[in-house]
């Protein structure tokens, strides 16, 4: 499907401010079009797109730390936690803590072989559906809360799922 549409599949982490008091976050494969910054990020390289109140969007790109530096960093964090070390973040005392929400709608692509998958997932609406000998897929809108509630059931199924329309679409043009 991705090759046919001229897109790449990338594993993308997203943290999105939904409202003044709420945010959502998730990690999911995403279909990435050639016009997006992250399209050209391959192999051991990482990329991040951020947007702040005092600046427009920024894209940062670079080589990942690799397995040894990453393992060292994780070990350091574990040791710090065992010794009750806490990183200081002074602004937390002055700002209201935002609330995490999964009550957001995602547009997703779901490829499946077992037909009961559509009975398990409750889409708000389906925009495209295909059934064939090689497999089936559906593109539609579904709540993140629904995906999280059904994740254990889906793990036992032959299912591939990808974010079809990034939350950050407007950031990445």
Enumerate the predicted regions with their spans:
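Substrate-binding/catalytic subdomain of NAD(P)-dependent oxidoreductase enzymes
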Residues: 1-40, 45-47, 66
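Functionally constrained cores in energy, signaling, and assembly domains
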Residues: 10, 14, 30, 58, ...
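A broadly conserved detector of short glycine/acidic/proline-rich loop/turn motifs that flank catalytic sites
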Residues: 13-15, 31-33, 54, 64, ...
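Generic alpha-helix signal with a bias toward terminal, lower-confidence helices
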Residues: 19-21, 37-39, 62, 72, ...
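Active-site lining segments that contact anionic ligands and/or coordinate catalytic metals
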Residues: 22-24, 45-47, 55, 105-109, ...
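Phenylalanine-focused residue identity feature
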Residues: 23-26, 31, 45, 59-61, ...
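ATP-dependent carboxylate/acyl-activation modules
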Residues: 42-89, 99-103
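A conserved regulatory-domain signal marking ACT and ACT-like small-molecule sensing domains
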Residues: 78-173
């Amino acid at each position: 499907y991705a090759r046919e549409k001229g897109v790449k599949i990338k594993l993308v982490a997203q943290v999105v401010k939904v409202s003044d008091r709420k945010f959502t976050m998730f990690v999911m494969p995403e279909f990435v079009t050639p016009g997006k910054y992250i399209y050209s990020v391959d192999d051991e390289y990482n990329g991040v797109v951020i947007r702040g109140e005092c600046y427009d969007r920024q894209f940062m790109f670079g080589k990942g730390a690799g397995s040894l530096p990453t393992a060292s960093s994780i070990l350091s964090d574990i040791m710090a936690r065992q010794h009750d070390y806490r990183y200081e973040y002074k602004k937390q005392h002055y700002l209201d803590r935002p609330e995490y929400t999964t009550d957001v709608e995602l547009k997703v692509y779901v490829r499946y072989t077992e037909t009961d998958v559509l009975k398990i997932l409750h889409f708000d609406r389906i925009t495209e559906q295909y059934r064939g000998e090689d497999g089936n897929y559906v593109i539609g809108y579904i709540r993140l809360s629904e995906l999280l509630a059904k994740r254990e059931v889906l793990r036992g199924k032959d299912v591939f799922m990808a974010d079809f329309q990034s939350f950050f679409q407007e950031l990445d043009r």
